[in-house]
Amino acid sequence: MKYIPVYQPSLTGKEKEYVNECLDSTWISSKGNYIQKFENKFAEQNHVQYATTVSNGTVALHLALLALGISEGDEVIVPTLTYIASVNAIKYTGATPIFVDSDNETWQMSVSDIEQKITNKTKAIMCVHLYGHPCDMEQIVELAKSRNLFVIEDCAEAFGSKYKGKYVGTFGDISTFSFFGNKTITTGEGGMVVTNDKTLYDRCLHFKGQGLAVHRQYWHDVIGYNYRMTNICAAIGLAQLEQADDFISRKREIADIYKKNINSLVQVHKESKDVFHTYWMVSILTRTAEEREELRNHLADKLIETRPVFYPVHTMPMYSEKYQKHPIAEDLGWRGINLPSFPSLSNEQVIYICESINEFYSDK
């Protein structure tokens, strides 16, 4: 068996055709037809009114926070079990991230812990739909409304996921997506900010375009940023969007093969009730942290790449000064593994991965 990476993009649609159109037209920077086409199609498919492209998923989060007016002295509640970009974006604004633990069943942010962490400085709750499984948005939105808080959805890992029949990204005041090369759809590097609020949308456009005023050419009235996506990236994104349903369907098939064939000593991250899980990364739990490293080494010997589940951000040096224990997130972070999950994986490859895992557990 050849080397199996943990992820690789599937560029099997009209990516080359659309990129060549950009090259032929010479519209290769942040202006061009594909920007608008991608934004419009993305908004339509995700059932939101407004969508604006950005250069990556991290700046999408920063832009969303800026649009909400989050700044120094504010607190933003965020799960500790997440990729660090979610937390860093809060720090970029001068606000303070307040960490919450995870739910043991779903791995998503704990609603009960959110409630305990709200203070008079809290301005927003940032929900991160970890590995493609939605958070409990009904309870989170209800809690946020009762406390007059903004809700930001970080959908970087959950494009196409649904909670009670509604797409993630449609529950919050503002939501973000990432299109890095290992995401469900990719632009190479890129992101999107979506909202149903025209004021927030306009603020995003203003900040992402160097703070350019609308009433006078080359007049800037705020300190803005260059967070724009290129036309070439948008062209790739549009081609990816046209294949998105097939990508997600295949990823769910892959997850089913894993669930049906992996040794019962391993716990597979599953789909909860009322949730449509897109399985960005099919993830498993070993019994101990030591066993995880042994299994990862075993799989590496079999030419199978894996990743550790994210380490809780509150344990990292720049965020651990006021350490508080978050036991569930810490447990998941030490025992979890991400398995190869990209759409072009063959059934034969997935079965080989399952057999390699089962071989490891054959004498356990």
From Swiss-Prot:
Pathway: Bacterial outer membrane biogenesis; LPS O-antigen biosynthesis. Keywords: Aminotransferase, Lipopolysaccharide biosynthesis, Pyridoxal phosphate, Transferase. Its EC number is 2.6.1.102. The keyword Transferase applies. Divalent ions have no significant effect on activity. GO terms for molecular function: GDP-4-dehydro-6-deoxy-D-mannose-4-aminotransferase activity; pyridoxal phosphate binding. Disulfide bonds: none annotated. The modification N6-(pyridoxal phosphate)lysine is found at residue 183. It catalyses: GDP-alpha-D-perosamine + 2-oxoglutarate = GDP-4-dehydro-alpha-D-rhamnose + L-glutamate. SUPFAM superfamilies: PLP-dependent transferases. Disruption phenotype: Mutant is deficient in expression of the O157 LPS antigen. Increases adherence to cultured epithelial cells. It is an enzyme of class 2 (transferase). Optimum pH is 7.5. GO terms for biological process: O antigen biosynthetic process. Belongs to the DegT/DnrJ/EryC1 family. Catalyzes the synthesis of GDP-perosamine from GDP-4-keto-6-deoxy-D-mannose and L-glutamate. Can use only L-glutamate as amino donor. This is GDP-perosamine synthase. It comes from Escherichia coli O157:H7. The lineage of its organism: Bacteria, Pseudomonadati, Pseudomonadota, Gammaproteobacteria, Enterobacterales.
